[in-house]
């Protein structure tokens, strides 16, 4: 199979898989909006940064270890076998604080995220359940990354889609027929990665599998080597959490809970958009790492060009759909028919999503830099878009233009990052 055909196979399957992951957040938002109105949407938006932090750690461990594994395997290095078990062990270590927070102090965590008394009272049960399932969220990221890098992207896609479908169906069953409310939504979301891991585990019984569990203690050295390549994935996932936290605080100050609920609508659709571009980057990563391990620089550059072109085309298609149907798209999560929330979300969607013309390229380029063992440049791109530029732009533009300035911070920061990314790519290429 030609490199181009492999690229489209890996990328398309990975996009579908990650779209499935983002869809269970959308399902949560929809059912919670039906059950609890704008307060429920505001609660979920306050919880999104916690989800992002959990996924970020899973991404750093999974993508970093799997990338290191793919490079070493392409070079015939037997040390590649140790990275899978090590990543799983460290996931259990990193998950422990989240589990303890879920048991002992979920209300403290919700207050820290900006929740008022109403939101905290509403969300304690929801937060407690999903925090207790943190190990499964992290390990799911690791298992799917290794299955994908071991030449089985189809199974990784099927596992993710099945987990997401379970979440959507049981969100409804747990919340309404069974009457569990918000804790039911959390339970459906929490069990979803358990099912995905079980399906992915089939890969390890195939004769073609080269991924093995190795009896070992957690190795700080292997962790550092993995995180070196996974830190851009960590920052990339965290960028959503940082953006959500900063925007929540600014919007609370500017217009209160209704503005936060409006941003909840924007943020949930943004999760879907980001999943699409992460699908391009993560789908190309095994092929780029394989080319790099075999010293095929031309192949790696070809994949970068394919990824950048794909990202631009997808951004244009995404914005065209959003611009044409902004009203109905916003109305899906506006169960109370709040005119003010609809007004805020309508303008927010149209301004915010301009950023994906730049963000798609930045995500693909950061994935490429990590896949070819250039972690410093990958981290610089991810840090710029995820923390430095977005925080600076949101503070400055909100002071100048109010709520529209908050929405404009995302496209402005991504445009700045795109300039930095082009400089980093051209410096060595």
Task: List the predicted regions and their residue ranges.
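Membrane-helix interface/capping residues of multi-pass secondary transporters
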Residues: 29, 38-41, 153, 182, ...
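Alpha-helical transmembrane segments of multipass membrane proteins
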Residues: 26-30, 100, 142-146, 168-173, ...
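Short runs within selected transmembrane alpha-helices of multi-pass transporters and secretion channels
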Residues: 62, 129-148, 156-167, 185-200, ...
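Small-residue-rich hydrophobic transmembrane alpha-helices
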Residues: 41-100, 137-156, 262-326, 359-378
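Helix-loop interface residues and adjacent transmembrane-helix termini in multi-pass membrane transporters
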Residues: 26, 35-38, 72, 149-150, ...
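Short alpha-helical transmembrane segments in multi-pass integral membrane proteins
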Residues: 1-15, 69-133, 177-231, 288-355, ...
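Hydrophobic transmembrane alpha-helices of multi-pass small-molecule transporters
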Residues: 53-56, 167-171, 197-201, 271-275, ...
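Transmembrane helix-bundle signature of multi-pass secondary active exporters and lipid flippases
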Residues: 14-63, 67, 133-137, 224-290, ...
């Amino acid at each position: 199979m030609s490199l181009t055909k492999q690229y489209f196979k890996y990328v398309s399957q990975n996009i579908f898989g990650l779209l499935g992951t983002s869809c269970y957040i959308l399902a949560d938002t929809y059912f919670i909006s039906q059950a609890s109105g704008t307060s429920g949407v505001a609660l979920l938006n306050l919880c999104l940064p916690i989800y992002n932090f959990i996924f970020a750690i899973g991404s750093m461990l999974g993508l970093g270890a799997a990338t290191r594994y793919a490079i070493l395997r392409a070079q015939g290095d037997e040390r590649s076998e140790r990275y899978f078990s090590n990543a799983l062990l460290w996931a259990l270590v990193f998950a422990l604080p989240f589990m303890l927070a879920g048991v002992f102090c979920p209300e403290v965590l919700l207050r820290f995220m900006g929740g008022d008394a109403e939101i905290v009272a509403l969300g304690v049960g929801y937060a407690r359940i999903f925090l207790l399932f943190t190990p499964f969220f992290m390990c799911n990221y690791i298992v799917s990354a290794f299955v994908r890098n071991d030449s089985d992207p189809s199974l990784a896609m099927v596992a993710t889609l099945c987990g997401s479908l379970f979440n959507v169906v049981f969100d409804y069953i747990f919340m309404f027929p069974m009457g569990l409310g918000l804790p039911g939504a959390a339970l459906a979301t929490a069990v979803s990665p358990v099912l995905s891991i079980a399906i992915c585990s089939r890969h390890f019984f195939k004769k073609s599998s080269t991924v093995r569990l190795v009896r070992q203690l957690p190795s700080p050295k292997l962790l550092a080597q993995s995180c070196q390549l996974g830190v851009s994935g960590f920052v990339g996932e965290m960028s959503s959490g940082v953006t959500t936290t900063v925007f929540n605080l600014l919007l609370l100050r500017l217009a209160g809970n209704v503005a936060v609920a409006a941003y909840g609508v924007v943020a949930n659709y943004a999760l879907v958009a980001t999943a699409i571009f992460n699908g391009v980057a993560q789908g190309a990563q095994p092929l780029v790492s394989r080319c790099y391990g075999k010293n095929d620089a031309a192949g790696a550059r070809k994949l970068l060009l394919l990824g950048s072109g794909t990202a631009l085309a997808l951004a244009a298609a995404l914005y065209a759909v959003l611009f044409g149907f902004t009203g109905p798209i916003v109305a899906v999560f506006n169960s109370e028919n709040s005119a003010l929330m609809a007004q805020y979300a309508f303008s927010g969607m149209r301004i915010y999503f301009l950023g994906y013309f730049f963000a798609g390229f930045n995500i693909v380029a950061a994935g490429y830099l990590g896949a070819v063992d250039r972690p410093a440049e990958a981290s610089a791109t991810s840090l710029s878009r995820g923390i430095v530029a977005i925080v600076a732009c949101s503070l400055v533009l909100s002071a100048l233009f109010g709520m529209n300035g908050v929405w404009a911070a995302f496209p402005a920061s991504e445009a700045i990052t795109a300039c930095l990314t082009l400089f980093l790519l051209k410096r060595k290429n």
